[in-house]
Design a protein with these regions (language model features):
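Non-globular targeting/processing and membrane-anchoring segments
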Residues: 1-105, 122-128, 132, 139-244
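Duplex nucleic acid-engaging cores and interfaces of nucleic-acid transaction enzymes
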Residues: 117
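Short internal beta-strands
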Residues: 109-114
Length: 244
């Protein structure tokens, strides 16, 4: 017997109508936040970052591909990793198919990681993604944006009780805990105007949930995300699930 509250169609409709009002308010609030993002000041990128790409070394300006806007997903795949972070991989599952649509809107989308380019491209082939991936390992790009951490910065975390989920994902990436958490995920946005690159937006942590499409879908199911802080994280690379 279900423990959930049971009601009539009339009760459901009345509560659904009230919920719809709140959902619309949230949508309008999201529109307002998007406007405020666009109104943030642009910051000139003064450092000469260099990236390894499939077409050879490029500057940050060279990554725009003839467009005026650039979105970079900072994918957790550091030099000691054997494979990409499973959560970042699930995000790339969502992002990769959007690259073509974004090009039609004057926007280039790509992935950037610190691992060697050949390792990134081999993993991309395994995952079946059709999106550009560049190596930023020879520059301070990730570090300057706050997506790379030193041992000293990590020391308080490493000296504490490591969450089992972190140990789990470190193993899945073929590295140790320090190697795993030395990388961080994020999204950064850029504009190219009159030959100058400007940083316009950066986000990380739950600011990336918009790209976790499965959470948006699960939030609309009866069980929701159905996660607990103590259980192992369920997210896997898409070729690692055991489907019934």
């Amino acid at each position: 017997m279900t423990e959930h509250r049971i009601g009539t169609q009339e009760q459901w409709q009345a509560e659904r109508d009230e919920l719809l009002k709140e959902e619309k308010e949230l949508t309008h609030r999201g529109d307002e936040l998007a406007r405020k993002r666009r109104e943030l000041p642009w910051v000139p990128v003064e450092k000469d970052y260099r990236f390894e790409t499939e077409d050879g070394p490029k500057t940050l300006a060279g990554l725009f591909g003839g467009r005026s806007q650039l979105l970079v997903y900072h994918f957790m795949f550091g030099p000691p990793y054997d494979a990409g972070c499973p959560v970042c991989s699930s995000i790339a599952d969502t992002l990769a198919p959007q690259a073509g649509h974004l090009k039609a809107r004057d926007t280039t989308l790509l992935l950037a990681s610190r691992a060697p380019l050949e390792r990134l491209l081999a993993y991309r082939e395994r995952m079946g993604w059709g999106i550009d991936w560049v190596s930023s390992g020879g520059s301070d790009f990730n570090r300057d944006l706050g997506f790379q951490y030193t041992e000293d910065e990590l020391r308080p975390f490493l000296d504490g009780q490591i969450p089992p989920t972190v140990e789990q994902y470190a193993r899945m990436c073929g590295t140790d805990v320090q190697g795993y958490v030395s990388e961080g995920p994020g999204l950064s946005a850029y504009a190219l105007s009159d030959g100058t690159v400007y940083r316009t937006y950066v986000t990380t942590a739950r600011g990336l949930e918009f790209a976790l499409a499965y959470y948006g879908l699960l939030d609309r199911t009866p069980k929701g995300r159905d996660e607990s802080a103590t259980e192992p994280l369920w997210i896997r690379r898409h070729d690692e699930y055991e489907m019934g």
